[in-house]
Amino acid sequence: MTEREIELLGMRKENINEYEGDDSYYYVLDLVNGLTFITECNTQVENNDWNVDVFNTEPTIRFTNFAEVQGLLNKLSKAIVSNG
């Protein structure tokens, strides 16, 4: 998946050490409390081929296809029950 596709998913860019002049960053999306999607650091990406992981799972749950992640996020978003 490309970096542009990561942005289209609504993931936000997080700089790692911007105050130290480091250009490293990753993307994150907190869908709900306890369910976070995260990418690898840009320095680990080869050929603009990004992955999206479900944060803090064992074993790792990883997606490489934009349409799959987009579909999953759409389904999960529709299933969110508001407490208000």
Q: What name fits each language-model region?
A:
Residues 70-73, 77:
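Residue-level detector of alpha-helical secondary structure
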Residues 1-15:
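Amphipathic alpha-helical segments
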